[in-house]
């Protein structure tokens, strides 16, 4: 079992934001968040059920905020003070079950990960929010010889739809966003030859 507690204070943390400039044009610019802070707790555990089977469990929690983040040059001026930092869910965890055959020729792994809701933009607008979600992955690897192996896998087995990135646009220009999504469910077989 490993556990850790952390505290970070940032000064002039850089953020890229699309804003309306003083000339009225739309532009992506880099700004410095005056002050921001993050506290976090991590727990990592590994438990051997048998000589061949292990369970891993990891947990993470965080509390983040921009203590001072004002952009007076934007039109209209922007104030993100008090907002949650990007990509910082309050809690997240993953659990995995791994078992190995007696002769070490095959490995079965089942894993599940979960994240609370979080924002992908310092504005914390709804358009940039990712709802809480969980992802399940399964894989089975078979070693036929030292040179040949086969892997059967399923990633995102429950076909969860979740965003990996959001580009938000300035409110005077409609305030919408462009979403980028993770891969859907993937099922496949890989055969590998080592030379």
Question: How should each PLM-predicted stretch be described?
Answer:
Residues 37, 89-91, 132, 146, ...:
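Residue-level preference for beta-strand/loop junctions
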Residues 14, 65, 161-162:
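Activation segment
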Residues 113-120, 141-195:
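C-terminal beta-signal and adjacent terminal beta-strands/loops
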């Amino acid at each position: 079992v490993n556990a850790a507690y952390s505290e970070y204070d940032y000064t002039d943390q850089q953020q890229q934001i699309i804003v309306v400039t003083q000339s009225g044009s739309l532009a992506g610019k880099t700004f410095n968040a005056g002050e921001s802070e993050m506290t976090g707790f991590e727990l990592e555990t590994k438990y051997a059920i048998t000589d061949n089977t292990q369970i891993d469990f990891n947990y993470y929690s965080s509390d983040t905020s921009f203590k001072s983040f004002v952009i007076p040059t934007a039109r209209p001026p922007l104030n993100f003070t008090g907002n949650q930092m990007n990509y910082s869910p309050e809690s997240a965890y993953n659990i995995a079950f791994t078992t190995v055959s007696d002769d070490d020729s095959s490995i079965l792994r089942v894993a599940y990960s979960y994240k609370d809701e979080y924002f992908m933009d310092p504005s914390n607008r709804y358009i940039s929010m990712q709802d809480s979600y969980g992802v399940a992955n399964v894989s089975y690897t078979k070693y036929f010889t030292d040179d040949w192996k086969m892997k059967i896998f399923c990633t995102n087995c429950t076909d969860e739809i979740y965003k990996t990135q959001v580009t938000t646009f300035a409110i005077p220009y409609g305030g919408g966003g462009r979403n980028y999504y993770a891969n859907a469910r993937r099922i496949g077989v890989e055969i590998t030859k080592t030379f």
